[in-house]
C-alpha cells in the first residue's frame, strides 16, 4: 500500500507533464528537439546570467504582464490568454530556464534564482515594473519576486498558486523522494495523458498539444536536463515556503482558483477543500481579491480563459 501511495504521490506532483487525448497517434509521433516545438507566436531569446532565456513578447500597452508558467510547462500554457490580453497590455510569456526553448543545465533552480533571472530579463527588455502573473509553481515564483524584488512588481496575479499549502518535514522528504529525474524520464505515454486530465475539470481539446509536445521531446538531446529541472523545482517549492511571509507583500494581488482543482490541496497528503486553501492564502495577503471559478480545475487560465482574461482586465483597470 505504501508503495502504491508513493507512486501516486509522484504522479500528482507531475500534473503539468501532460496529455489529453486517446489517439493511437501518440505512439507514432516523431522525436522533436525543444526548439522545434511550434509556439504559434514568434519566440525571442536573450542571455541572462549566461543562460539563453526564451520568451514571447506581444502587445504594446503601457502596462506589462510577465507570465510565469508552472512545473513541467512552458510559455505555451498562456496561449489562451496572450491573444486577448495583448490587445491592451504588453505581454511577456517566458520559458523559465530548464523549460521550453530556454537553456537547460544543472543550474541553481531555486525560486529565488528564477525571480532574479526574471528581474534581469525585465531589465534587458527595458521594463521597470511589471504585473507578475504566475500559474501554480509560477505563482510561488511571483510571490518570491514580490518579496525579493518589490520595486519590480506592480501587482500580482496568482492562478492556482503553489505556496498556499503547508507541508511537514516528513511530507516534504516524501515528495522529494517521489520525484526524481529518473521518475520524470520514465513517465509513460499513458501516464502523461492521465496527468493532464487531472489538471482540468474537463480537459479542452485545445490542450491536446500538451501531450503531443511532451511525447515528442522525450527523445530530445536535452530531455535529461529537463527532467533534472522538474525534480529540482519540486525541492525548490518545498525549500522556499512563502505562507508565513504573505503579510509582507503589499502590492495588490488577484488570486484565482478553480473550484474543482484536484491538485490543491494535495489529495494524497491532506484532506480539505480547494476553497479553504485559497481563502487561507488570500486572507494572509494584505491587499488581495479572491475569485473562484466553478467547473474549473488547476489549469484555470487554459480551461476558463474568457473568465480569467476578463477578471485580469478588471483587476488591472
Residue spans of the language-model regions?
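Conserved alpha/beta-hydrolase catalytic His-Asp/Glu region
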Residues: 186-247
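Flexible "cap/lid" loop of the alpha/beta hydrolase fold
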Residues: 143-147, 156-187
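Active-site loop/oxyanion-hole signature of alpha/beta-hydrolase fold enzymes
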Residues: 39, 48-49, 56, 96-133, ...
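Acidic catalytic loop of the alpha/beta-hydrolase fold
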Residues: 260-272
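Alpha/beta-hydrolase fold catalytic core
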Residues: 2-63, 88-89, 279, 286-289, ...
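Conserved HGGG/HGGXW glycine-rich cap/lid loop of the alpha/beta-hydrolase fold
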Residues: 51, 56-101
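Short beta-strand/loop motif that positions the catalytic acidic residue
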Residues: 249, 255-257
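Catalytic active-site module of serine/aspartate enzymes centered on a nucleophile-bearing elbow/loop
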Residues: 284-317
